[in-house]
Amino acid sequence: MNIQEKLRAWADVAYDFYSKEAYTLDLDFYTQSDLTLLTDDKPVELMVIGINPGHGRNYQEERFAKPEDLLRGNCDFKKEGNPHLNIFEWHIVRRLRSILGYGKIGDLLNDESRFVLTNATFFSTPKETGLDDLKVKEAQKVSIEYTKKLIDIIRPKHIICLGGKNCMNLLLDSTTRLLGDVVKLDYGVIDGIPVYGIEHTSSFWAREQMELVGKALERAFEQDHVPIDYGEFYNQSKDIIESFIKKRNDRDEIEHETALRWEYIYASLSNYCKYNLGLEVFEESKDSTSFYIPDEEGKSDIIISLVNQKGDKSVGVRYSI
């Protein structure tokens, strides 16, 4: 059988399981990439596995009327006029491409027939915590076997898992941290295929973290045709690890210096408004003070706001309504 015949046979049994369980759990379910694009003459270079679809709608029978629909991917993104029609513009794909770009392997995500985006389980929940429900958890454990079968059919050269306990930890019994405790880059093997676990690309990534993981993955991809030895890989990666630590420390130092400067600015402006201009305090809380300039009737006409809080360091002026 060719790969499309194998995928159709897989879809028959996967659809039977998911449609019944999704109806019982009242959960939506779907895949991501269009698997009908895969061919035997173009092997898949990279499979990217997320946790689960995050839309979180209830069960919708019309979305997948037959097993073949499961192969066509996220049908919402296929709708005419949808601005997210192009899978390459999805945030998690763009972020991953940026990460891999530091290792000059971002082009692995340029051809949907050469890479596959899927999920460890196809049940959709608004947040990952939706998988903690006992009945969903039981169904999730069974669903992983269909994901493993999909991996076995596609046989990608490399797999990247986004997230931890509900992704890579469900697929593999044991993993190794290739970069130690410096940055998350887990490694394991499933049926001879190298698997890497990184932080989910929907979360925050510092630039130096993206650079380290991207360059480390490039080196790993070059040698993972045989099992990777953790000790050897870590030693080979000391140059990029040291570069990461230096950049992280430099950034922390800059952030600390910036915080000190803002403390000075905040204190100076607060004192100037209060003592030099004689403005009255409108509102005051920790590291946030507002002063008002009264109109002819003594009402607060113009508000000057000074803020020196984490994530918000600003000076603002507004008219009181």
Identify what each model region corresponds to.
Residues M1-A22, D133-E145, C167-R261, V315-G316:
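C-terminal capping/extension of enzyme domains
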Residues H55-E61, G298-I321:
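Intrinsically disordered, low-complexity regulatory segments enriched in Ser/Thr/Pro
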Residues N2-H158, G164-L170, S203-F204:
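A polyanion-binding, active-site-adjacent surface
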Residues S174-K184, K274-D287:
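Short secondary-structure junctions
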